[in-house]
């Protein structure tokens, strides 16, 4: 009987410990052990750019998803849980009846669907509005999903994107599809193994994009990246290191050889 009581007491202690570990912060919606409130902006950051994040249902349940960092940091952002973009998503996203702003969507370039870099787009946009003191705000559409799902989402959204006159843009850093991605231990900003070299999280992609197109872009990018770095720092304590794939190691070795030859 005494042994049974002792077992019950141990079980209750375990349940209390588990409950304590599962306690969620009311502000950032993350477990208390990895709360990010100390790095989140005290006030949501305003942007001229209207940001729409099409959030794949599977990705929204992933514990390492970075879209919540954006919705907790930016004022002018809308998260839409869906597998494809619909007309109503962009017609009512801003909540106004004003004409739709110039629209861009962030996705890597491909031979069949080329994209302009965000820096090139910024130069073209400034050139087109050089006689206007206050250029119209932009609308940025981002697809948050795994690489496979994101490609499916973009393809399923092509009609609406085309009707909106959306321009496909990519980050200045190119994606190398011939190389497997790295891990959290290869970068301060990567949370999990990416499919290709050059891939980044949604939060970093949006931060880099806003850094290029917003008037106060550098400061906005710095704030968002600091939040992401802290999230990665926390998560790295609980993630098991993964060895880079052979293709990635081979690519790094090839890149190092020219540098070593130059030094000789």
UniProtKB/Swiss-Prot annotation:
Keywords attached to this Swiss-Prot or TrEMBL record, sorted alphabetically, are: Metal-binding, S-adenosyl-L-methionine, Transferase, tRNA processing, Zinc
The protein depicted here goes by the name tRNA-uridine aminocarboxypropyltransferase A
Annotated GO molecular function terms are: metal ion binding; tRNA-uridine aminocarboxypropyltransferase activity
Recorded E.C. number(s)?
Answer: 2.5.1.25
What InterPro entries does the annotation carry?
DTW, DTWD2/TAPT
The keyword Transmembrane is assigned to this record = no
Record-annotated membrane-spanning stretches: none
Residue ranges, annotated region (Disordered): 245-264
Report the top EC class in one word. Answer: transferase
Where on this chain is DXTW (motif)?
144-147
Q: Where is the composition biased (Polar residues)?
A: 254-264
Where Zn(2+) binds, per the record, is at 25, 28, 35, 37
This chain's function reads: Catalyzes the formation of 3-(3-amino-3-carboxypropyl)uridine (acp3U) at position 20a in the D-loop of several cytoplasmic tRNAs (acp3U(20a)).
Q: Which reaction does it catalyse?
A: a uridine in tRNA + S-adenosyl-L-methionine = a 3-[(3S)-3-amino-3-carboxypropyl]uridine in tRNA + S-methyl-5'-thioadenosine + H(+)
Q: Which gene encodes it?
A: DTWD2A
Query: What family does this belong to?
Result: Belongs to the TDD superfamily. DTWD2 family.
Free-text note on domains in this protein's UniProt record? Contains 1 DXTW motif.
Q: Can you cite a GO biological process for this protein?
A: tRNA processing
